[in-house]
Amino acid sequence: MKIVIQRVKEASVSIDGKIAGAIDQGLLLLVGIGPDDQAEDIDYAVRKISHMRIFSDSEGKMNRSIQDIEGSVLSISQFTLYADTKKGNRPAFTGAAKPDKASQLYNSFNDHLEELVPVKRGVFGADMQVSLINDGPVTIILDTKNR
């Protein structure tokens, strides 16, 4: 799994002009599923994201987690994180998991994360418009294959 983690003041996702999900302070996650991903990748990602200390404490140090601040997550499926740009000018996305597998793992990831923090979701495979106000900005890339 490849996940772009962005600390946000607020974020929302719209589909066909209608808001499908919105959060206040928390994390916007762009979630890509690879062909070799499985349950252990989900467990690792959920553990890291829910405990990652990237929110400021009273002294301004990044010392608090999403759970500590009682924040929320907006999770967006993002197969383009597996783009291959080596040849030509048009990215290839053959490195991403097939849609059936990716959808199942994406939903499982969100279900597991939702046991720890509130999660709003985009719609897998939909054309979405994502709006956000970055906080910091703080943007971290998590790759479950690089542990």
UniProtKB/Swiss-Prot annotation:
Subcellular location: Cytoplasm
Catalytic activity, EC: 3.1.1.96
Alphabetical list of Pfam families matching this protein: Tyr_Deacylase
Domain of life assignment: Bacteria
An example Gene Ontology CC term for this record: cytoplasm
Recorded GO MF terms: D-tyrosyl-tRNA(Tyr) deacylase activity; Gly-tRNA(Ala) deacylase activity; Ser(Gly)-tRNA(Ala) hydrolase activity; tRNA binding
Reactions this protein catalyses: glycyl-tRNA(Ala) + H2O = tRNA(Ala) + glycine + H(+); a D-aminoacyl-tRNA + H2O = a tRNA + a D-alpha-amino acid + H(+)
Assigned protein family: Belongs to the DTD family.
Subunit organization: Homodimer.
Record text about domains: A Gly-cisPro motif from one monomer fits into the active site of the other monomer to allow specific chiral rejection of L-amino acids.
Protein name: D-aminoacyl-tRNA deacylase
Native source organism of the sequence: Streptococcus equi subsp. zooepidemicus (strain MGCS10565)
Gene name per UniProt: dtd
